[in-house]
Amino acid sequence: MFKIMKDFTEQEKIIVLDFGSQYNQLITRRIREFGVYSELHPHTITVEEMKALNPTGIIFSGGPNSVYDKDAFRADERIFDMGIPILGICYGMQLMTTHFDGKVERAKDREYGKADIHVENPSRLFAGLPTDQVVWMSHGDLVVEEPAGFEVTATSPSCPIAGIADEERLLYGVQFHPEVRHSVYGNELLKNFALNVCGCKGDWTMENFSEVEIAKIQEIVGDKKVLLALSGGVDSSVVGVLIHKAIGDQLTCIFVDHGLLRKGEADQVMATLQGEFNMNIIKVDAKKRFMDKLAGVSDPEQKRKIIGNEFIYVFDDEANKLDGVEFLAQGTLYTDIIESGTATAQTIKSHHNVGGLPEDMQFKLIEPLNTLFKDEVRALGTELGMPDAIVWRQPFPGPGLGIRVLGEITEEKLEIVRDSDYILREEIKKAGLEREIWQYFTALPNIRSVGVMGDGRTYDHTVVVRAVTSIDGMTADWARIPWDVLEKISVRIVNEVDHVNRVVYDITSKPPATVEWE
């Protein structure tokens, strides 16, 4: 039986140090796929802080710097002396090499893309893998002399030292990126590191995660009360059920109908969470309040801030009617934390659960999902006994339709998005594609175009259909929806939604785009 670990340090885990690679979150995600808990930390972490985490293994990510740059990212060198396994990837391998007095130089030509490597010495890292394999390279420097005590484990035509290992000290490095899907046996290599080198059992599951989180919530909250920002989306709904299992009626859910919800959403949320789970939900009609604040505002960042601030002020108003409320719960995910920026990465956009809170907020935050990716949240919801109708609902941002209407928000524009999105969801479900497509929705860009309807000229709105496939939301590809399904969606939207004469399909992946338009 799983032992509830109130002390987080008891849990086996692999820490990924962030040196600025665009792929570092993928490393964390891949390790978790093997049933091993992993999380990302800045490269500035001290050895004392690292010891407090009690990691089973450490991975140094890649990064854009050269190890010889004046301002290159460094790690606390004492981490190398902790006596636990370390894997350096790309820049991480070069950092390990220079620390142990090996030699790194600028490559004559930068190498980006697929490459063939030959495994010279399998070591534990390459155990059971083919001698020749395709990997993904992305580097401008390379190791030209391995440190004393290390062996060369892999080579490639343009990178004579593509892998190194010191088996005695359990130190390993690879010049390529095993976390990227283009590295054909990358997953197997990372699994070797996690299970064979680090000795992890691979028993991290949503069952033990929920038990640990329930125990933590009970310990943190005690006999106090918690307010939950219930948006109606998957994340906040799962948070609500998790916290309700931990503290029961000490949880009060504040469901704010801000006028930015999907069609029929308010009624569905109340019927499911209040009716089936007997949760205490206060519904607040704040449509006019939000629309007044958003009037004339076009900038997406400003809209996010206004919506985030107004949410908190609504909660303040409701909290004043309750006694003993000290905590605010949110459905912040790990991807939200990462996308809102770390010490080594540029902020992509301030997230509604991360960067939209006022400085004078009166509550302590509880974010029990902030170490999980979206697919893990769905798995947790299923583990908690939630119905598929909630667990597999389409992801919905905290600012709601406020960021799916580009530019200024009006009632007319909101109705267009509501009705078109409803049609899209109906047709995707009819086609049996709702589990195959990770996320799909409509958005209203601030674009009007000329059209012909009946015998007359029109000058009306354009609706964008956005649909992507993904595993965890960190990267995404546009979904290949069959043409006949797209045709049905387009015909219905143009004919059934007022003031729309054009439908376009977004075929951009993430990156370079994000999933949402704002």
Curated annotation (Swiss-Prot):
One of its GO terms (cellular component) is cytosol. HAMAP family: GMP_synthase (MF_00344). PROSITE patterns: GATASE_TYPE_1, GMPS_ATP_PPASE. Gene3D superfamilies: 3.30.300.10, 3.40.50.880, HUPs. Residues 204-393 form the GMPS ATP-PPase domain. ATP binds at S231, G232, G233, V234, D235, S236, S237. It comes from Listeria welshimeri serovar 6b (strain ATCC 35897 / DSM 20650 / CCUG 15529 / CIP 8149 / NCTC 11857 / SLCC 5334 / V8). The lineage of its organism: Bacteria, Bacillati, Bacillota, Bacilli, Bacillales. This is GMP synthase [glutamine-hydrolyzing]. The gene is guaA. Keywords: ATP-binding, Glutamine amidotransferase, GMP biosynthesis, Ligase, Nucleotide-binding, Purine biosynthesis. Its EC number is 6.3.5.2. The active site is at C90 (nucleophile), H177, E179. Pathway: Purine metabolism; GMP biosynthesis; GMP from XMP (L-Gln route): step 1/1.
